[in-house]
Amino acid sequence: MLLTNILCLMMPILLAVAFLTLTERKILGHMQLRKGPNTVGPHGLLQPVADAVKLFTKEPLHPLTSSKLMFIIAPTLAFTLALSLWAPLPMPHPLINLNLSILFILAMSSLAVHSILWSGWASNSKYALIGALRAVAQTISYEVTLAIILLSIMLINGSFTLSTLTITQEQMWLILPTWPLAMMWFISTLAETNRTPFDLSEGESELVSGFNVEYAAGPFALFFMAEYTNIILMNALTATLFFGAFHNPLFPELHTINLTTKTLILVFLFLWIRASYPRFRYDQLMHLLWKNFLPLTLALCTWHMTMPISLAGIPPQT
């Protein structure tokens, strides 16, 4: 039964990842006044299938001087962790109902850093290693603000469980009282998923393709799928934390459709930002976090901690 549940969760995620790649290419094409993929199938709809067949039937090459075992483990770990992060997400019922689901997501996303570092080190290429070090420094740095923002939201929620956020936001979505946190959260998720304007790890003019430069065929596809799975997850998490998850005053019974619609709008925003913004310089990226976001999030966390106590917004003592 559990295996069936896992498959029912994973298959739609993999389909969503496949068609997100097509959506991204179509949207970028239209924004750059061109058509995008339009040859494979009607209106290019079978392009993801063709890409998957091409990648998984190619020979997986690896450099002679690379560490072969770690070279294969790194993309497998990245993809496994990206999928396991979906387990505690309520849609409307989570696969695993954890009391500390927020901590589980934070811990598992921290583990993903190892796959990036291993891939860069195991490739035995200076470009891959520099790209991996950049990506690791960026990911670890922005996880600090993500954790503090999550703590602030959990102080309002009163629990570390994602499922209770829906009840918390029945009267008002948390985007309204905590909009500065929401803005910093959204920018941090862009940095966490290595997306434009924070895709420093794959600066083509400097590092070719970043930490996955030596990868080809199946292992490269696993990294690619892990990245897009994380993008959808981060946007689903944003919808759950700030936009009332599947709460919609007009159609309260359409649980999953409400969550999916909000997630799709946020994913479209990710793609719009990719089409619009240039890449940051690395020192600007770090200054934004350590000199701007960190002091602001700490101040707002203290504010959200003291406000309920000062206004006596505490549960009644029985």
UniProtKB/Swiss-Prot annotation:
Report if keyword Electron transport is assigned: yes
What is its membrane topology? Multi-pass membrane protein
| Record key words, sorted | Electron transport, Membrane, Mitochondrion, Mitochondrion inner membrane, NAD, Respiratory chain, Translocase, Transmembrane, Transmembrane helix, Transport, Ubiquinone
Q: What is its EC number?
A: 7.1.1.2
| Family assignment from sequence similarity | Belongs to the complex I subunit 1 family.
Query: Any stretches that span the bilayer, and where are they?
Result: 2-22, 69-89, 102-122, 147-167, 172-192, 231-251, 253-273, 294-314
This entry's Gene Ontology molecular function terms read:
NADH dehydrogenase (ubiquinone) activity
For this record, the Gene Ontology CC terms, alphabetical, are: mitochondrial inner membrane
Broad class of the protein's primary localization: mitochondrion
Reactions catalysed, semicolon-separated, are: a ubiquinone + NADH + 5 H(+)(in) = a ubiquinol + NAD(+) + 4 H(+)(out)
Name listed for the protein in its UniProt record: NADH-ubiquinone oxidoreductase chain 1
InterPro entries, per the entry: NADH_UbQ_OxRdtase_su1/FPO (IPR001694), NADH_UbQ_OxRdtase_su1_CS (IPR018086)
UniProt superkingdom = Eukaryota
Stretches of the chain forming a coiled coil according to its record: none
List the Pfam families: NADHdh
Keyword Iron-sulfur in record: no
A GO BP term here is: aerobic respiration
Kindly list the places in or outside the cell where this protein is found, as annotated in its UniProt entry: Mitochondrion inner membrane
User: Which residues are connected by disulfide bridges in this protein?
Assistant: none
| Function summary | Core subunit of the mitochondrial membrane respiratory chain NADH dehydrogenase (Complex I) that is believed to belong to the minimal assembly required for catalysis. Complex I functions in the transfer of electrons from NADH to the respiratory chain. The immediate electron acceptor for the enzyme is believed to be ubiquinone.
